[in-house]
Amino acid sequence: MSGHSKWATTKHKKAVIDARRGKMFARLIKNIEVAARVGGGDPAGNPTLYDAIQKAKKSSVPNENIERARKRGAGEEAGGADWQTITYEGYAPNGVAVLIECLTDNRNRAASEVRVAMTRNGGTMADPGSVSYLFSRKGVVTCEKNGLTEDDILAAVLDAGAEEVEDLGDSFEIICEPTDLVAVRTALQDAGIDYDSAEAGFQPSVTVPLDADGAQKVMRLVDALEDSDDVQDVWTNADIPDEILAQIEE
C-alpha cells in the first residue's frame, strides 16, 4: 500500500527534532564503536561497521566523531566503554507487543529506566520469549525515489535476495533476510542507486490496529523509552494508519 510502511510504524522512526539530535548522534556513535569492536576497525572488511558509518554520515554526524568512535571500538584509541546489548520485552497499552533493544555499559541502570518508562506510560514488562516470538529478524534497506520506479528497484535487488519492496511515497523500503543485507545494499550500489540506510531489525508477524487514542498512548510510551540514553531501538506490532501517524507527529 503506497505511503504505508509496516517497518516505519513498527520501529516508529519519527523525524528527528533538534532536541533529540544529541541522543541520535550518541546512538549512531555507539553503533560504530560496537561494530568496530565485534568485527574489526576496517569498514572494507566489516559490512556492519561500513553501514553504521554510512548511516552516521547521512545523519550529519561529524567525521571526526565517527573516526574517533571507530578507533575506540577497534582498540586504536583509549576510552571505549564496555557496551552490552540487552533486549527487553513487554506490552504497551491496547495489548501492543514491544521489543526494546538497549546498548548500555550499566545493565542495572538500563533495566531501571526501561521499567520506569513502561510503568509510567501504561506498559508492562514481560518474560523473555513471551513477546519476541511475534517478531522476525529482518534486514531493511531504504532509498530515496529520485525518479526511480518500484520496477527499477526490483530489477536491481531481486536476485540479491530481496523479499519485498514497499513504496513509501518519497522513498522505497526493501525487506530481506539479515544475511542478505550486504548483498541487497551492494546490488543497489552496483546499479548506481544511492541508499539511505541498511540495518537489521524486527518485523511483526501479527499487528494490532489502533485508533487515534490508542496510537497516542503507544507513541507516548515509545517516546518515553527513547528518552533513555541506553535505549537504541524500540519495535512494536502496532498498526497505525498514515493519517493518524501524521496527526501525532505534527
UniProtKB/Swiss-Prot annotation:
One of its GO terms (molecular function) is DNA binding. Signal peptide: none annotated. GO terms for biological process: regulation of DNA-templated transcription. It holds the Pfam family TACO1_YebC_N. InterPro entries: Integrase-like_N, TACO1_YebC-like_2nd/3rd_dom, TACO1_YebC_N, Transcrip_reg_TACO1-like, Transcrip_reg_TACO1-like_dom3, YebC-like. The keyword Cell membrane does not apply. Keywords: Cytoplasm, DNA-binding, Transcription, Transcription regulation. GO terms for cellular component: cytosol. It is found in: Cytoplasm. NCBIfam families: PRK00110.1 (NF001030), PRK12378.1 (NF009044), YebC/PmpR family DNA-binding transcriptional regulator (TIGR01033). Belongs to the TACO1 family. This is Probable transcriptional regulatory protein MAV_3481. It comes from Mycobacterium avium (strain 104).
